[in-house]
């Protein structure tokens, strides 16, 4: 089931050392899913994956959370993907929690500037409370 869910069935007979970075990442996630634990700790599970596979993997993890009640704790540096799937975000800088809560409360212009030194707009493109971070172009004049 975990091989099917991560689309890695065709890789089952191959050595991990023969796999690309994205294939390897999906195999590691399949191995974690096969454990059927109540809690999954994932460190950058979307690393090496193209955008379509990132979304697919995070949708799978969200599905596991909804259907099995599996708690997911993961590190994600891709803010828009984190905002898309997380019920609760914790933003840290140098090991200290700077902000926590729902995506809209954490991903604000002041927080992005404080945490990442990033000048950005935070928009709700679907008018449903979801947020997307849009970085300002380098050297752009930034309205207050």
Segments from the language model and where they lie:
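Conserved ABC ATPase "signature" region
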Residues: 1-11
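Conserved catalytic motifs of ABC-family nucleotide-binding domains
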Residues: 36
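Catalytic Walker B motif of ABC-type/P-loop ATPase nucleotide-binding domains
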Residues: 40-44
């Amino acid at each position: 089931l975990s091989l099917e869910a991560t689309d890695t069935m065709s890789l089952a007979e191959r050595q991990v050392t023969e796999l690309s970075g994205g294939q390897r990442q999906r195999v590691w996630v399949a191995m974690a899913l096969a454990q059927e634990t109540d809690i999954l700790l994932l460190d950058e599970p979307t690393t090496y994956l193209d955008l379509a596979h990132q979304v697919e993997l995070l949708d799978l993890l969200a599905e596991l959370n909804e259907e099995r009640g599996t708690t997911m704790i993961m590190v994600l540096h891709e803010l828009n993907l984190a905002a898309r799937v997380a019920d609760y975000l914790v933003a840290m800088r140098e090991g200290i929690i700077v902000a926590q809560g729902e995506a809209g409360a954490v991903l604000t212009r002041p927080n992005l500037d404080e945490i990442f030194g990033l000048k950005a707009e935070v928009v709700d493109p679907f008018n449903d409370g979801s947020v997307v971070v849009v970085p300002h172009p380098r050297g752009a004049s930034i309205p207050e």
